[in-house]
Amino acid sequence: MAEVGRTARLALALIFTTAAHAQLLNKDAPVIVGHYHLNVTSIEAHKKFWVDTLGGTAMKFGPGIDVIRFPGVFLFLREQKPTGPTRGTAFDHIGFAVPDVPKLTAKVVANGYGLTVGREPGPGQTASPPTAGNYGRFSYLVGPDGVKVELVTNEEPGAPPIMHHHVHFANKQFVEMQQWYMKAFDATLRAGQTDYFIGADLPGVGYMLNFFSWLPEEAQTGTKGRAVDHIGFEVRGLEAFTHKLEAKGIKLTEPYRKAPELGNIGVAVITDPWGTVIELTEGLRDLR
């Protein structure tokens, strides 16, 4: 069984490696993961992690909103003490792709940040040790306020120093969760499903949505108020898309509107059945 587990992990590592470059922004993709909204205790502490350590770019958006830009994604920072880390919600971590995982991981540790595991053990199981990169291909980091980040290897020639790669969920109902996201965003099942992992690909983008099984006994809570408050999907034809969601039986938490405070982009909000808040936008990709 241990050998099967090692083989599965290696297979996942190879998938991560070969798929990374596909996440460069496809301007024609109907749906992309466009941003994450973080509640942070300190803007400056987060800049030291996201900018000084990982290599993002600090910028301002709209009425003085602090934003960190990476190729493929924005992180919106709101200075408001979070109610908890990403752990404990069905949102597990943000995935980035880099050319040299061990090198950047060493920098992260040298700058005082911690490492963690990919999947947490269940009752009576032995925890995996903190990782400096399984097979040197990927590692899991913990930033300020308990935001979990994964680094995966990008071996494509000319790969940027860092780029957004995927979003990863963890849930006891991980298969049902994957099916909900396929339904909502017209994603497709990805090959390589295991007894603890399943993925979904966004149209025109490919590798993006990953789902782990959640083994700990503790119940999970919603993302609102947590370190990662919500995930943002950028959608072409957003108003019509919201009507399609409603026709699928997916209710809007907040109806479609134009947001003048954000440059008049289109905005709507939905919440998945496990409490993950999802902001839908149209217009953010034009700022890249």
Explain the meaning of each model-derived region.
Residues 1-6:
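N-terminal secretory signal peptides that target proteins for export/translocation
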Residues 8-19:
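Bacterial N-terminal signal peptides
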Residues 24-28, 31-42, 66-67, 84-169, 190-194, 198-213, ...:
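Vicinal oxygen chelate
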Residues 27-67:
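Mature N-terminal segment immediately following signal peptide/propeptide cleavage
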Residues 37-40, 53-58, 95-98, 112, ...:
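Sec/Tat-exported extracytoplasmic proteins
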Residues 46-51, 108, 146, 177-182, ...:
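Conserved active-site tyrosine of GNAT-family acetyltransferases
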Residues 173-196:
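Solenoidal tandem-repeat scaffolds enriched in leucines and small polar residues
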